[in-house]
Amino acid sequence: MRRILSIFVFAIMLAGCSSNASTEKQHAGGEKTVKAEPQSTSSQKDSTDDYQPNSQVTDDRSLLKVGQTFSDDKGKAVLKDIKQVNKTYKIGDVELTVKDMKLIHLRPDYSMIDYFHELTHDEEFDFVKVFVDIKNTSTKKVNVAPIALMKTNMGETFDWNKDIYLEELNGELEGGAEKSGNLGFIVNASSGHAHDKAADAEKKTKEIKWIEITTSDVFDHKHKKISDAQKIKIKF
């Protein structure tokens, strides 16, 4: 139910993004998504200290070295790769700080299988996650999504409704307000079809080397676009 409500509420906002994307394809000389440039993060606090563990996904904050594991009542997580990013990107009046990126292998507890079942039929799987801070530096309410799309070097592309954390980072952000939390996407998932077993096995042997995040456009309280989306590429 939480996933359905999240999708319903944010679908209205991203309708504008979809419309803009279609227009961009039709008019090659028009507006384009631009690459974001990192800003200084020296004055920012460590928001991970105040983070409340997710109710669906195993807490990974103690996983700082490859090979480390952590288990709780939601499952067992193994850290496969990590990148401390700590860079801030400007999207108009919105500051998006990417704190870190991790590749995690997760074996969910049996009680959590149904939650992940709509995204994968695998009993255990890898996912890529980022911890972000998002801040509205203006005095007026805006609407924005830190990750509207994510793609990997494997050729996989995920939109915002494939996020496994659902920490309400998308949508309205009051003037001067900040949000912090995780966004994560299951990668290299099996197709669930017997005839695709060979292709699934090949996917499992390949490595995630980078991801590219595309934010949403930024909209004002009347859903008028005020800033273009940004693209952010992060390498492990």
Write out the residue ranges for each language-model feature.
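Sec-dependent signal peptide recognition
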Residues: 2-10
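N-terminal, intrinsically disordered, polar/charged segments of Gram-positive cell-envelope systems
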Residues: 5-6, 19-89
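C-terminal motif of bacterial Sec signal peptides marking the signal peptidase cleavage site
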Residues: 12-19
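Surface-exposed edge beta-strand/loop patches
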Residues: 18, 43-65, 149-159, 173-236
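Low-complexity, acidic Ser/Thr/Pro/Gly-rich terminal tails and inter-domain linkers that flank the onset
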Residues: 68-123
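Mid-length scaffold segments of soluble, non-membrane domains
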Residues: 107, 114-166
